[in-house]
Amino acid sequence: MNGHSDEESVRNSSGESSQSDDDSGSASGSGSGSSSGSSSDGSSSQSGSSDSDSGSESGSQSESESDTSRENKVQAKPPKVDGAEFWKSSPSILAVQRSAILKKQQQQQQQQQHQASSNSGSEEDSSSSEDSDDSSSEVKRKKHKDEDWQMSGSGSPSQSGSDSESEEEREKSSCDETESDYEPKNKVKSRKPQNRSKSKNGKKILGQKKRQIDSSEEDDDEEDYDNDKRSSRRQATVNVSYKEDEEMKTDSDDLLEVCGEDVPQPEEEEFETIERFMDCRIGRKGATGATTTIYAVEADGDPNAGFEKNKEPGEIQYLIKWKGWSHIHNTWETEETLKQQNVRGMKKLDNYKKKDQETKRWLKNASPEDVEYYNCQQELTDDLHKQYQIVERIIAHSNQKSAAGYPDYYCKWQGLPYSECSWEDGALISKKFQACIDEYFSRNQSKTTPFKDCKVLKQRPRFVALKKQPSYIGGHEGLELRDYQLNGLNWLAHSWCKGNSCILADEMGLGKTIQTISFLNYLFHEHQLYGPFLLVVPLSTLTSWQREIQTWASQMNAVVYLGDINSRNMIRTHEWTHHQTKRLKFNILLTTYEILLKDKAFLGGLNWAFIGVDEAHRLKNDDSLLYKTLIDFKSNHRLLITGTPLQNSLKELWSLLHFIMPEKFSSWEDFEEEHGKGREYGYASLHKELEPFLLRRVKKDVEKSLPAKVEQILRMEMSALQKQYYKWILTRNYKALSKGSKGSTSGFLNIMMELKKCCNHCYLIKPPDNNEFYNKQEALQHLIRSSGKLILLDKLLIRLRERGNRVLIFSQMVRMLDILAEYLKYRQFPFQRLDGSIKGELRKQALDHFNAEGSEDFCFLLSTRAGGLGINLASADTVVIFDSDWNPQNDLQAQARAHRIGQKKQVNIYRLVTKGSVEEDILERAKKKMVLDHLVIQRMDTTGKTVLHTGSAPSSSTPFNKEELSAILKFGAEELFKEPEGEEQEPQEMDIDEILKRAETHENEPGPLTVGDELLSQFKVANFSNMDEDDIELEPERNSKNWEEIIPEDQRRRLEEEERQKELEEIYMLPRMRNCAKQISFNGSEGRRSRSRRYSGSDSDSISEGKRPKKRGRPRTIPRENIKGFSDAEIRRFIKSYKKFGGPLERLDAIARDAELVDKSETDLRRLGELVHNGCIKALKDSSSGTERTGGRLGKVKGPTFRISGVQVNAKLVISHEEELIPLHKSIPSDPEERKQYTIPCHTKAAHFDIDWGKEDDSNLLIGIYEYGYGSWEMIKMDPDLSLTHKILPDDPDKKPQAKQLQTRADYLIKLLSRDLAKKEALSGAGSSKRRKARAKKNKAMKSIKVKEEIKSDSSPLPSEKSDEDDDKLSESKSDGRERSKKSSVSDAPVHITASGEPVPISEESEELDQKTFSICKERMRPVKAALKQLDRPEKGLSEREQLEHTRQCLIKIGDHITECLKEYTNPEQIKQWRKNLWIFVSKFTEFDARKLHKLYKHAIKKRQESQQNSDQNSNLNPHVIRNPDVERLKENTNHDDSSRDSYSSDRHLTQYHDHHKDRHQGDSYKKSDSRKRPYSSFSNGKDHRDWDHYKQDSRYYSDREKHRKLDDHRSRDHRSNLEGSLKDRSHSDHRSHSDHRLHSDHRSSSEYTHHKSSRDYRYHSDWQMDHRASSSGPRSPLDQRSPYGSRSPFEHSVEHKSTPEHTWSSRKT
């Protein structure tokens, strides 16, 4: 304790306590890299240990403070200490703290020589503008590139790191190979917490905030500068609105920001952060703090030992896991001590208390069984938490030793991923885990690492058989291989020497894992082949593989490549290569299928000496993407490990053979021709060909000591309730069943699944209500009586429990496992459970608990499909298969979990089958699948050609076709319906011994049997003997009956009557149901009307209707038959990935990888992809043709949707994603080699990131998006070929680019590609488009004449008739447009359907600005800040007219300023973009959007110009002699950009259309418009001036604008303000000036529009005629005709022109 003041002084100089700022988000990134001695407050992790907020700390420190801290450091004189003795004599946490202090002081001594270095870096001025920040920081970054790459993308160095950081970085290049591991600056750090018991008031010394001085002053100064820069940038990026209470007040935004380093920032005190509460107890008062850590308890004893709460006062204490510290530093704390220390995260305490109280309340009322179950779960969890305190392996160490003489170690903890690694104090780790340290240094110094020049890779040696087990196999424990395993090892070695890759296909339980590891060990020791060996295994067996490698081949370095992106990056940093030699560190890499596919590019880049695939039957489909990915890996030898090499067809066997030996088994057609069915002696030749490549042994042949396995099939009848439900399901689905072979497969399968559920238990069909039973006994009885199987199982388990047997119970259905678990709890039978939801360590705990010596667990509930192979439950001697699987192989695997090596008792297998049900028939048919397995693999027969089918498996889930399914469904149904409704008989009571005696029994006798007996014995289900033979003979007769004969007519009539009643109810209750449907729509359900429609029109509808009691049962899935083989979750994943790629139907392999659907065949994926695409197109078309609801705002419209199976798809969203990524898909080469050379063809603007970012990085980012999908930033980061690993997603969240910045950059780059593509296509198509244009003229001209005649002849309809006529004409126009556009465009454009039915391009961007653009706009609009503020807030007391005039003046002032701002640009694209940005900025100050404001401004400016130029227009009646300067300027503007003009009329690609329309505002007029290109002098007076070309161009202008005029028109009238009307010209006599078409140079390039309307759509507007009448100029002056009609809203025109004869045309949306 007396060293406390010393500690404080050291803390003052080191800034060490700053680690508690982890929760600020900088934990992983801003810590320094390699401080071996930074544990001044008792910490043990010193290299990336300190973790401070980089901005607040450095910005707050002045130069004088830095100098003071340096002086303090100079004064510290460390004593000499023997570190090892020091630890032995003082093993408490205080001693650890002191050792760290001494170590720190020694480091300070070494740094004195560097103190005089230059301070110029820190004096550098840090500008507040973002540009100067970036440019200067880039210079700094270049100086320190070496440090940057070591940080793994974590950003700039942090000032809170250790003193030895820079020195260590300099030493990196010179340190030897064993010390080449450097500490990361971006990972979770863990240190021993400070001695919290010493902190009385929780206040930390402010001096702790002083930053440490690195050995290099330049580094220190750079840190200062970087952090100041970040600080000022954070200030600059605040989104400040101009809306203030005092309009003209000078606010903070008007002031320039000063340099960050001149602005002192308040110091923040930093405290520890609670990560989670692990446990709670009542403990002795004061038994809290650092003395309660596990190492302090081991050293000094437990302060809580011997506490009895009844005899002495106690207090509630909580076990705390501290953020940034490993579990080894967990401490017990009270609420009081936590408050004293001012820790962060106290809200978690309240949550923990609330949860704890709820648990205690539940336990108080729970039954003893529930309490016991809860306690067991807690015990498992506690065991798991204890593992978190055990070091699994050390992966790095610091290069500098502490005062105690130990380096710090980077530790990976058991049961936790690599991302949870932490730096720990060397003295502590060496005391507790010295073995891990020895292994670590042994691995680092090992000479047995892989090297490319190993000669046996090029020339295989001669095979020498192993007569006895070599000494190197068996590990330290001296384990022995069995004889057949040694033979297997010899066979594997022989195959390798011969150059044959092979398949190890031993039956489950024979030790394929051990044989494989022994083979790798053989290569390692006999042939000095040190790897790299890749083992791809399922997740469920990965820990088993890891354990066996450690046991049998401990000399080999095996790395488990698993976890999230951070974990895998950690492995690649520390476990992959030696930093000096770049040679691989590991011999064996263990990974899973999923991780292999995620990191395909990285792992596929290595040359593997060996690839082994466990559970290789996942490769049986050669069309799956998993298969295609793995087969491309470079390997010298391949081994497939599978217990079931053949499941359904010979094609699957060929797929495996093709994978291992693609040259030898190259063609399936040749293989089928040689060994296919009908070929005499075909199988003999096949056996001979397979011999060198496939080894298959079964237990009874090789393991004579394995006890017998006896199977009994127990048949039982259904309970009365089951019979009722069974008949009810069949009756309800009568319509679907009666279709027979014309029905849908999915429909039959759904019925089948419902019947299988019914056979298992009634609760699967209709669960009971919560309060249905009064007591536990009644609930138990009802549970048992609801299933015939459970009645029998109950008797069986009671008998087995008496005998002392231990039981495995398998079911396919997880909900059935729930019911069985409930039953076992009622019976108080202790059990474990394993299904798909129980993962990783919990699964391992359950297995170990069951297999433990003296375990009291009686049952183990397992899902048939869960767990994979390799799970050993040999301590059980009884297997109950509650329901048989479609695939008999799964049941065999289930049995083998008990009947395997190590089993000492006879294994009894009881298969429960419901008599007279679909189950019985399924079982009979499924056994035929086993015959194939025997004929080919077991080599038992060579004449079974009639049985073998060589085609592909019909389905992975069910092997039956429609005819078989229909026959199975009829099985037993007739007998069932013979019992009258409501009089179903309960099954007869029978003694369990009698049942077992009568059951058919099959034993696997060791002697050879006949072929048929052997087949059935292997399958364990013999043909149904004795009492059931009659049933099988009756099957053909039963199958011939129709469902009308099976289901009684009265029951069918009753069902029809119920349906009629339901329909009538729906008709009468329609309004209420419509409301109801709205209320529940958020659940994704549908109204009952749609349900009844589907019920009558679809096969599978009727199925789902018939099985929905109490909203249970399978969901309604209408088109499920179209997507066979995909679950809803898989479809969701597919659609999510589908949206990430352009041209998704050409990128199915990438989609499958991203969606983790690599097991699916490309054919299935293509089918699903086409279903999605076509469904979206259809939904959009249906939506555009149907009437949408009016009213409501655009932003709220979700767009058309449709359903695929149970998944709702937003058609608009999917198509928009697809279209937006098309430019990327077209630009990036599909060939991988060409893709590597790709460079973006456009000039790109600078990216203001915190790292150097150039054109090459932009190109790599686009390549990454192409390969991995839009948004897959982590995958892009991990691809070494893209060189973005250290550039994107830095670990410091304050550093850019993070995901948000990458998305913005990607959008910008794709937009550039779109424009570039559009230009190229425009140039390439210019010639042909001119020819087409000439033909189009004539048609459009003819149409114009027709329209003119119609206008003349039409009389004005009554106002009341107007809307109907308008609608008719509108619909006619729209339909014409749709028909023509199909012909003129490459493909249909994706559209958003507005309420009025007019399509608007789907790719219109939302009006949002990124932060940087917003800031620029803000600065540019600062001169009109007052006008912006007043825009929406006119003075009080003004009349309506005055208010409107006020608003108009503000708008004119703002608009004129924008026009001035745009003059600095010459590029039309830039002008368009910045006009858009500035108007969007203006829109933030008013309720109008940017388009509306721009349009209103143009109206206002037009009015101003008209009033000024009215006299000029009257004096110049002839338009051809006008010399208005505006018109002259217009002609100049329109006389250039020929390529743009040519492309105007050409057939352009869809994407260009989208690109332009995304960016433009609705009200914009068009720059360099082609319609204004013709010289006015070409017109003659009178009607002759209207030549066809003139109309063609003008009408295109108007018809194209038609699409975009709809946005404003469909809004409700109250949405418009009077502002719009007042700002427009209401007088028809006003003359339009020539400058109307050119408002402030606001013209779009002629390439803006690419879609052409048909000639029927080109109608001139009545405005032209009205202007002609009102004007004193010549008849139909071209200038008058060319007024921008688009500037008037349709609403205004309908009001203005009602009195005119042609007002019908005025209302047409143009």
UniProtKB/Swiss-Prot annotation:
Record motif DEAH box, residues: 614-617
Cellular component GO terms held in the UniProt record: chromatin; cytoplasm; nuclear chromosome; nucleoplasm; nucleus
Residues that bind ATP: 506-513
Region (3 X 5 AA repeats of H-S-D-H-R) residue spans: 1628-1644
Location of region: CHD1 helical C-terminal domain (CHCT): 1409-1511
Gene Ontology biological process terms from the UniProt entry: chromatin remodeling; nucleosome organization; positive regulation by host of viral transcription
Principal location listed in the UniProt entry: nucleus
Basic and acidic residues: bias regions: 1-10, 67-85, 1370-1379, 1523-1573, 1582-1670, 1690-1701
Keywords: ATP-binding, Chromatin regulator, Cytoplasm, Disease variant, DNA-binding, Hydrolase, Intellectual disability, Nucleotide-binding, Nucleus, Phosphoprotein, Repeat, Transcription, Transcription regulation
Composition bias, Acidic residues: 122-136, 215-226
Low complexity bias: start-end ranges: 35-63, 105-121, 152-163, 1507-1516
Domain Helicase C-terminal intervals: 792-943
Domain Helicase ATP-binding, chain residue ranges per copy: 493-663
Keyword Hydrolase included in the entry's annotation: yes
Location of Phosphothreonine modifications: 237, 250
Each Sequence repeat, start to end: 1628-1632, 1634-1638, 1640-1644
Chain ranges of the Chromo domain: 272-364, 389-452
EC number, UniProt record: 3.6.4.-
Record's function text: ATP-dependent chromatin-remodeling factor which functions as substrate recognition component of the transcription regulatory histone acetylation (HAT) complex SAGA. Regulates polymerase II transcription. Also required for efficient transcription by RNA polymerase I, and more specifically the polymerase I transcription termination step. Regulates negatively DNA replication. Not only involved in transcription-related chromatin-remodeling, but also required to maintain a specific chromatin configuration across the genome. Is also associated with histone deacetylase (HDAC) activity.
Subunit structure and binding partners: Component of the SAGA complex. Interacts with BCLAF1, NCoR, SRP20 and SAFB. Specifically interacts with methylated H3K4me2 and H3K4me3. Interacts with the FACT complex, the PAF complex and the U2 snRNP. Interacts directly with PAF1, SFA3A1, SFA3A2, SFA3A3, SNF2 and SSRP1.
Record note on domains: The 2 chromodomains are involved in the binding to the histone H3 methyllysine at position 4 (H3K4me3). The CHD1 helical C-terminal domain (CHCT) binds DNA and nucleosomes.
Connected disease: Pilarowski-Bjornsson syndrome: An autosomal dominant disorder characterized by developmental delay, speech apraxia, intellectual disability, autism, and facial dysmorphic features. Some patients may have seizures.
Family matches, as PANTHER family: CHROMODOMAIN-HELICASE-DNA-BINDING PROTEIN 1 (PTHR45623:SF7), CHROMODOMAIN-HELICASE-DNA-BINDING PROTEIN 3-RELATED-RELATED (PTHR45623)
Name of the protein described by the UniProt record: Chromodomain-helicase-DNA-binding protein 1
Taxonomic classification: Eukaryota, Metazoa, Chordata, Craniata, Vertebrata
